[in-house]
């Protein structure tokens, strides 16, 4: 019996954390659900189609405008006008996909949270069509809350109880959900912790990167910046680019090698939404041609990125899923974060003191945290090693919950 799972909020292109979540869900659910096929409602349909190597994954365009206006309107019409349903299924790929789905997985990384009200309409639009078609909605491990803001609290109280299951990504999110009175929650860990390496990453990277850079003796310090953090730091009067450039130069002057790698990329596109390539190119230009410096000016897959990050000695990042990759590969990490979603993941490893926010950003702070990581290397590696198996198990457990809901639909 074929089971059909629709997915929204993730992608193969752009943010490689979203790619890791998508690929992890396909891998884990394909082994738990018989004859599983998947439909991705894509914000970047052309780019995702170009990268789609999955025979059982269909890509359907769902750009913000199309999702918010067309798909939501048709889904509402489907609900209130039963006589039009055959026509709607025949005329709209999106409605046909939803109507045949056993569940919709919402893989947004952080939704329904105070301070991000400009994304609230998209958060609602992502799940409302499925709710109107009475398709079970499962919010894969993600951060939600806090709910102190009037608009966000209202929307959360209206829509989140209608979701079949919310997988909370950490203790802070779970406490926020409890405080809102939600009872449809289960504890989990980010789906990207379930991503497994295929084993061919080195071979696939060799034509793209000189891997002798990470093979040679000595320390390699990795840097994965974020345009989101750049806006937050610069908005406070800081200088994110210059701060990281100076940190990289200081790393090189200390005799270490420095690897600059974008974890969110849209090749051939200069827009910076979910695209750190332009930022990384600016940083690389400022650093210049220096011995021991390597900039990865490529769009790598989530598995290639994880392999490469795993070859570093220490890692500095402002990208959430770059942090997931470094922790998954047991690499001591400095996190420059902007919300509770970073803290609650580091809490799983007892490493919440290894992060700081935009207000504290400076070259001196980055270098001080790197020095502290170097000093505490054995202790930090032991903390990651002792907690990683349980975190991965918690991540994979959401696949069991999803499979139960999907198979129950038949």
Predicted regions: what is each one?
Residues 1-410:
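Active-site anion-handling motifs in enzyme catalytic cores
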């Amino acid at each position: 019996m074929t089971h059909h799972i629709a997915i929204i909020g993730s992608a193969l292109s752009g943010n490689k954390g979203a790619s890791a979540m998508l690929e992890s869900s396909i891998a884990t659910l394909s082994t738990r659900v018989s004859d599983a096929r998947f439909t991705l409602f894509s914000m970047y349909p052309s780019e995702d189609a170009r990268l789609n190597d999955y025979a059982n994954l269909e890509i359907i365009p769902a750009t913000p405008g199309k999702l918010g206006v067309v798909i939501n309107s048709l889904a509402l019409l489907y609900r209130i006008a039963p006589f039009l349903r055959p026509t709607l299924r025949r005329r709209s790929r999106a409605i046909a996909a939803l109507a045949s789905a056993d569940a919709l997985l919402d893989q947004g990384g952080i939704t329904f949270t105070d301070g991000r009200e400009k994304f609230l309409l998209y958060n609602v639009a992502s799940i409302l069509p499925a709710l109107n078609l009475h398709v079970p909605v499962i919010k894969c491990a993600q951060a939600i809350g806090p709910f102190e803001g009037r608009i966000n609290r209202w929307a959360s109280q209206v829509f989140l109880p209608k979701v079949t299951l919310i997988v909370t990504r950490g203790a802070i999110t779970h406490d926020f959900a409890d405080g809102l009175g939600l009872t449809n929650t289960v504890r989990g860990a980010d789906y990207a912790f379930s991503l497994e390496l295929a084993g061919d990453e080195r071979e696939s990277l060799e034509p793209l990167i000189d891997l002798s850079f990470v093979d040679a003796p000595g320390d390699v310090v990795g840097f994965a910046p974020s345009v989101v953090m750049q806006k937050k730091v610069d908005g406070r009067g800081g200088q994110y680019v210059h701060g990281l450039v100076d940190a990289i130069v200081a790393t090189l002057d200390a005799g270490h090698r420095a690897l600059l790698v974008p974890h969110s990329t849209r090749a051939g596109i200069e827009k910076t939404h979910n695209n750190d390539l332009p930022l990384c190119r600016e940083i690389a230009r400022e650093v210049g041609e220096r011995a021991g410096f390597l900039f990865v000016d490529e769009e790598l897959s989530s598995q290639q990125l994880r392999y490469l990050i795993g070859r570093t000695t220490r890692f500095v990042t402002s990208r959430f899923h770059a942090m997931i990759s470094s922790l998954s590969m047991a690499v001591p990490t400095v996190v420059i974060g902007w919300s509770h979603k970073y803290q609650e993941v580091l809490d799983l490893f007892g490493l919440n003191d290894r992060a700081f926010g935009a207000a504290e950003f400076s070259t001196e702070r980055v270098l001080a945290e790197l020095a502290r990581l170097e000093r505490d290397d054995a202790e930090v590696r032991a903390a990651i090693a002792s907690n990683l198996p349980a975190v991965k198990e918690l991540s994979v457990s959401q696949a069991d919950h999803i499979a139960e809901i999907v198979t129950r639909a038949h």
